[in-house]
């Protein structure tokens, strides 16, 4: 939902007609694991299977590729929330499904649990990069708005406040996953949030 793994098998010498989504997925995984500053162009060549000239031609420089991965993450997360809202499950089951997908995604990564690319990497770069900051703000607003929409549709009278609590827990789960928290700890925190909101 918010961060499902984009891991793919690495391929070298990818043909000219490469799949843009697949390449962005591979780049997302590398950035998610190593962060923006910690990811080199050689890392991206290794992850995507594209050589530097092809990467530059398709996406521009490293920063432009990073921004494209953030845009893709926002779009994919929004789509996941839309599907959850459309499923029309009761409030408790909706929240349980949301957190289950989130925890599953956060526990994936190239070298171990990597959390959410937005929370784990863009928050650092947002301080001095206006475009990254704008994307992070858009992501946070999208999360707040979609979870509020979900809760309003289920009749929650405190939907706005509860949505912000849920978003805060989602971000905490990302940090805890990167810190090595076991699945049981993440699931317990998610269950506490569900109980707080759904009663």
Task: Indicate where each model-derived feature is located.
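N-terminal intrinsically disordered/low-complexity leader segments
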Residues: 1-18
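Hydrophobic alpha-helical segments that form the core
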Residues: 4, 101, 114-123, 158-176, ...
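Short helix-capping/turn signature of helix-turn-helix
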Residues: 59, 120-128
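Short, basic, alpha-helical segments at the C-terminal edge of helix-turn-helix-like DNA-binding modules
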Residues: 71-77
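Amphipathic C-terminal alpha-helical segment
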Residues: 105, 127-128, 149, 167-185, ...
């Amino acid at each position: 939902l918010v961060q499902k793994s984009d891991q793919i098998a690495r391929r070298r010498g990818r043909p000219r007609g490469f799949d843009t989504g697949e390449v962005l997925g591979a780049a997302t995984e590398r950035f998610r694991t190593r962060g923006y500053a910690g990811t080199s162009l050689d890392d991206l060549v290794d992850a995507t299977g594209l050589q530097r000239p092809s990467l530059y031609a398709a996406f521009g420089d490293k920063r432009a590729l990073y921004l494209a991965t953030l845009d893709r993450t926002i779009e994919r997360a929004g789509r996941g929330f839309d599907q959850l809202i459309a499923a029309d499950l009761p409030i408790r089951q909706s929240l349980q499904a949301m957190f289950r997908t989130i925890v599953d995604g956060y526990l994936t990564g190239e070298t171990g649990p990597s959390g959410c690319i937005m929370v784990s990497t863009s928050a650092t770069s947002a301080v001095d990069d206006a475009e990254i900051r704008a994307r992070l703000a858009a992501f946070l607003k999208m999360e707040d708005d979609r979870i509020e929409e979900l809760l309003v549709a289920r009749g929650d009278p405190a939907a706005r406040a509860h949505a912000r609590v849920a978003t805060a827990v989602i971000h905490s789960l990302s940090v805890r996953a990167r810190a090595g928290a076991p699945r049981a700890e993440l699931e317990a925190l998610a269950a506490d949030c569900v109980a707080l909101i759904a009663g």
